[in-house]
């Protein structure tokens, strides 16, 4: 696996969404009573087997900060790329704060029968159109922004533990993000329903450079520091 610095990030998504395996390493920050602190790390990992993809994230606080805020979250999304579209089959998430499991569920998507089945026993109807999850939406969004550079709004049918809903992503404009004393030109995209803000690299096919997420009373930021493909 060839190591590439942020300056030379290679192509992740083509216009046909030909997904390529990669690992993105991020620093994890949280707003605390002592200010915005680097408290841990996160990794995004895209694995490919032909047209089948497995996309995972792992975020956790370092041992030094566990007394202040002990947090971990892992997600997994699987599916395939068909005719330039991301088609989901499965999604899971485990989120812990201290010793308490806040989220732990799986969702199996049966596209040809238009429903999704949760590990809680609930069954959700899928409306016409493609379905993504809170993780694979990153893949779908990057591809759509490549193919529709002048579009300012993207809407997706997203499934999670609460069911299937439509989420709207708004392109707010360009914004420079400083990483290692270098300004990276990005496009800022927000999703009000998820309390999510993305900064996607203009030069590197809208690879997430910064991901800002509000979880309850805590705000987290993931900042890209290294990319491997």
Give the role of each language-model region.
Residues 19-108, 148-229:
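Acidic, serine/threonine-rich low-complexity disordered tracts
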Residues 96-138:
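Hydrophobic, well-structured mid-protein blocks that either form specific transmembrane helices
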Residues 122-127, 131-162, 171:
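Flexible, glycine-rich surface segments
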Residues 4-14:
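Sec-dependent N-terminal signal peptides
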